[in-house]
Amino acid sequence: MNVTIKTPEEQDKMRIAGRLAADVLDMIGEYVKPGVTTGELDQICHDYITGTQDAIPAPLNYRGFPKSICTSVNHVVCHGIPGERKLKSGDAVNIDITVIKDGFHGDTSRMFFVGKPAIQAERLSQVAFESMWLGIRQMAPGKFLGDIGEAIQKNVEKQRFSVVREYCGHGIGRVFHEDPQVLHYGRAGTGLELRAGMTMTVEPMVNAGKRHVRLLPDGWTVVTKDHKLSAQWEHTVLVTDSGFEVLTLGAADR
């Protein structure tokens, strides 16, 4: 396992990339409404990243991915490909943004609701959000990856939901997906010991039904096997000398 420790200069570049990724999510919210296609949302984000931000959308052509963002609607767990699908009132959509600026990546996602959300969708999103933060709050030098996973898993399962196991968080920096893998389940005190200067994503995918998923024939889109809803939130996080720093906070939370 090759886990990179970021220098202070690299940490500053990660802060910039993280803020830009969060700014895209701040910007796109007003466009998430009935009748818009996921492809149109992708184009708006692409133009904003490449034009306004003078940055690079990391997903575009990454291992053959054809678009600049991921849009995962309702029972889509992750890596949904934007296209002709029109959003309708009641839909829940995760928008996942990764930008590259000055060689470094910032990666974050949020849930958005189209019109009035269903009660279960709103609750599922809230549990995913809370679980992400419970995991993040475990991060500090001397803590372990298993501390993050256990905190997330316990909270999700307490709510009678389930944690997806096939997909996880990851180290991030000059490379989109670096070591280590950040599992959203596990046992406290196990796994890699955290050190100051590590940067990684925490991004639990939480299913309303069972945890099992399947990959669609497009090779990217992951859906729940039981066709029930899924929700996800994601932040890029730096381990600091005293704890953690979230690099992808939206403007309202900075």
Go through each PLM region and give its residues:
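Active-site neighborhoods and metal-handling regions in enzymes and metal-associated proteins
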Residues: 1-254
